[in-house]
Curated annotation (Swiss-Prot):
Modified residues (Phosphoserine): 216, 534
Record-given protein name: Amyloid beta precursor like protein 2
Chain intervals with Acidic residues compositional bias: 218-234, 242-269
Binding-site residues, Cu cation: 163, 167, 184
Annotated site, Required for Cu(2+) reduction, chain positions: 186
Residue span of region Interaction with DAB2: 693-707
Biased amino acid composition, Basic and acidic residues: 270-282
InterPro entries, per the entry: Amyloid_Cu-bd_sf (IPR036669), Amyloid_glyco (IPR008155), Amyloid_glyco_Cu-bd (IPR011178), Amyloid_glyco_E2_domain (IPR024329), Amyloid_glyco_extra (IPR008154), Amyloid_glyco_heparin-bd (IPR015849), Amyloid_glyco_heparin-bd_sf (IPR036454), Amyloid_glyco_intracell_CS (IPR019745)
Subunit comment: Interacts with CPEB1. Interacts (via NPXY motif) with DAB2 (via PID domain); the interaction is impaired by tyrosine phosphorylation of the NPXY motif. Interacts (via cytoplasmic domain) with APBB2/FE65L. Interacts (via intracellular domain) with APBB3/FE65L2.
Species per Swiss-Prot/TrEMBL record: Mus musculus (Mouse)
Length: 707
């Protein structure tokens, strides 16, 4: 009995030791990494791992490993970077005392407070995905496996994929098992933010309910401005940080609350909604930076008589999405429909694979030709399923894209109408005009950001296609730029109001210009030989504050004299430049337009183009005449060539008609010719030939000689 008790006590002690080791393993690993950081730095005990964060238009942030707090760029100049290699170099510059060997995108976003713009005092908090600066030899993350969860890992030495790609694969792997992704980590680095494998934990879907409810409660507690940031957070999921600054001004927000009762509903509330369908195709709450990982499946031949197994799950979410129109819940309904399609496709594939395995087991004793036919049948079935899934997903994404573009256009149109209404009010109120202008510029920026994100996604996935669409992207960006500048030029109708809000306008334009310069500089390395390449090479001119208004004397009573209410729908026949209805493709002929133009508020905002050369008070450049002369010269040369060709064709036709008519007259036989029955057949034939116009060339020659 004593021996038995001793053995039981020993077993219990071993179990407790193993339990303690299991509980302390993650903490020990993290502590070891922190101690390694401190030893590497030589500056004291580190409390945080080195990380950097970027937000375009604002200074880069990095973690102070001694304090654990986020600090701005020490040089005060560095903003968002362009490549992962630049991120690695920046990590090495920020942490020179550490041996930074690689970078890796973090799995979860962070909220950084007091994030300021360059040379600005305005600071706000933003939610971004930071980059981890990896020190020394790579150490994989320690993953916890909760109850009822499963641990998996994948290693492919022949594959070197990015962080986002591995995340997509593990998420799909969990969905295949009927689970959801709980956590994951990278294995075996093979490049900058590239790895040979990953390890991950999948849990039942009920495990994520608590975390989702916690996140929703936290979002409800945010202020109005922060809610705008959260909604724009759906945008911050590009393959590389290209977040544009969509923050609203805090002063304007406060003023809006003060004047809500006066303005009523004339200025429509501009909810900061935006969804990027090109980056958000594979987006989920676990990793907002996940890119689209599924392209169009290229199958040359599909067997059409293959019967696709029926859908095991209902398609209510998909049907509801297509049957209902767009609303404020567009993004949520799109996500639900997309997830439903993925689950349905996975179940179909699992069913086909299971049937394939069963058929192979039963076909072991069959001849080789029959087994080959069976294999081809299932291969065709798999291809048909993949093609159908790709088609359904493409239809879903295209529908969502069209709805998002329509929503952006509607909000931009409403913002422009409110801005025009504010200008036409009697008397005009400067603050209300500024507020409406900010909303309009914000709506234009949504469209610009939508276009930029689309191009950046295509550039990362298909550079060849990006090169083909670059001219279209730049044209659309120029259209947005000119449309916005022309709207600003409408302030010329009320110069005293424009002078009062001049500083706010300059600041607003400079903020938008900073983001635009960042994008144009990133794509200027890949020129495209198209018609608009001359405009693209110039890109966007450096920022000049908008001062189209003459200085006014303080002694003059300018308000009654300078104020001329704009008649709604008529507008600016005397004003240089105006709003006209046109397609965006005529942007290349913008310098040839008439100066007397009319505002028509019924026009779709997307179809308006403007003459931006006179918006900033700049004189029209004489070089603008050059393209007109060149086009005229080319048109004249083409016209002359067409005339020459037409004359030649007409000459050939006339000659042909004359020859044909001459031949017809030559074959006419005049009257009845009596034939001598005594003539020989040769003589009869000669007479017949002479009757039809035949002349003996010898006789004809002799006659000509006598003449």
């Amino acid at each position: 009995m004593a021996a038995t008790g001793t053995a039981a006590a020993a077993a219990t002690g071993k179990l407790l030791v193993l339990l303690l080791l299991g509980l302390t393993a993650p903490a020990a690993a993290l502590a070891g990494y922190i101690e390694a950081l401190a030893a590497n730095a030589g500056t004291g005990f580190a409390v945080a791992e080195p990380q950097i964060a970027m937000f375009c238009g604002k200074l880069n942030m990095h973690v102070n490993i001694q304090t654990g707090k986020w600090e701005p760029d020490p040089t005060g100049t560095k903003s968002c970077l362009g490549t992962k290699e630049e991120v690695l170099q920046y990590c090495q510059e920020i942490y020179p005392e550490l041996q930074i060997t690689n970078v890796m995108e973090a799995n979860q976003p962070v909220n950084i407070d007091s994030w300021c713009r360059r040379d600005k005092r305005q600071c706000k908090s933003h939610i971004v995905i930071p980059f981890k600066c990896l020190v020394g030899e790579f150490v994989s993350d320690v993953l916890l496996v909760p109850d009822n969860c499963q641990f998996f890992h994948q290693e492919r030495m022949e594959v070197c994929e990015k962080h986002q790609r591995w995340h997509t694969l593990v998420k799909e792997a969990c969905l295949t098992e009927g689970l959801t992704l709980y956590s994951y980590g990278m294995l075996l680095p093979c490049g900058v933010d590239q790895f040979h494998g990953t390890e991950y934990v999948c849990c039942p879907q009920t495990k994520t309910v608590d975390s989702d409810s916690t996140m929703s409660k936290e979002e409800e507690e945010e202020e109005e401005d922060e809610e705008d940031e959260e909604e724009d957070y759906d945008l911050d999921k590009s393959e590389f940080p290209t977040e544009a600054d969509l923050e609203d001004f805090t002063e304007a927000a406060a003023d809006e609350e003060e004047e809500d009762e006066e303005e009523g509903e004339e200025v429509v509330e501009d909810r900061d909604y935006y969804y990027d369908p090109f980056k958000g195709d594979d987006y989920n709450e676990e990793n907002p930076t996940e890119p689209s990982s599924e392209g169009t499946i290229s199958d040359k031949e599909i067997v059409h008589d293959v019967k696709v197994p029926p859908t095991p799950l209902p398609t209510n979410d998909v049907d509801v999405y297509f049957e209902t129109s767009a609303d404020d819940n567009e993004h949520a309904r799109f996500q639900k429909a997309k997830e439903q399609l993925e689950i349905r496709h996975r179940n179909r594939m699992d069913r086909v694979k299971k049937e394939w395995e069963e058929a192979e087991l039963q076909a072991k004793n069959l001849p080789k030709t029959e087994r080959q036919t069976l294999i081809q049948h299932f291969q065709a079935m798999v291809k048909a399923l993949e093609k159908e899934a790709a088609s359904e997903k493409q239809q879903l994404v295209e529908t969502h894209l069209a709805r998002v573009e329509a929503m952006l256009n509607d909000r931009r149109r409403i913002a422009l109408e409110n801005y025009l209404a504010a200008l036409q009010s009697d008397p005009p109120r400067p603050h209300r005009i500024l507020q409406a202008l900010r909303r309009y510029v914000r709506a234009e920026n949504k469209d610009r950001l939508h276009t930029i994100r689309h191009y950046q996604h295509v550039l990362a996935v298909d550079p060849e296609k990006a090169a083909q669409m670059k001219s279209q992207v730049m044209t659309h960006l120029h259209v947005i730029e000119e449309r916005r500048n022309q709207s600003l030029s409408l302030l010329y109708k009320v110069p005293y109001v424009a002078q009062e809000i001049q500083e706010e306008i300059d600041e607003l334009l400079q903020e938008q210009r900073a983001d635009m310069d960042q994008f144009t500089s990133s794509i200027s390395e890949n020129p495209v030989d198209v018609r608009v390449s001359s405009e693209e090479s110039e890109e966007i001119p450096p920022f000049h504050p908008l001062h189209p208004f003459p200085s006014l004397s303080e002694n003059e009573d300018t308000q009654p004299e300078l104020y001329h209410p704009m008649k709604k729908g008529s507008g600016m026949a005397e004003q240089d430049g105006g709003l006209i209805g046109a397609e965006e493709k005529v942007i290349n002929s913008k310098n040839k337009m008439d100066e007397n133009m009319v505002i028509d508020e019924t026009l779709d905002v997307k179809e308006m183009i403007f003459n931006a050369e006179r918006v900033g008070g700049l004189e029209e450049e004489p070089e603008s005449v050059g393209p007109l002369r060149e086009d005229f010269s080319l048109s004249s040369n083409a016209l002359i060539g067409l005339l020459v060709i037409a004359v030649a064709i007409a000459t050939v036709i006339v000659i042909s008609l004359v020859m044909l008519r001459k031949r017809q007259y030559g074959t006419i036989s005049h009257g009845i010719v009596e034939v001598d029955p005594m003539l020989t057949p040769e003589e009869r034939h000669l007479n017949k030939m002479q009757n039809h116009g035949y002349e003996n060339p010898t006789y004809k020659y002799l006659e000509q000689m006598q003449i």
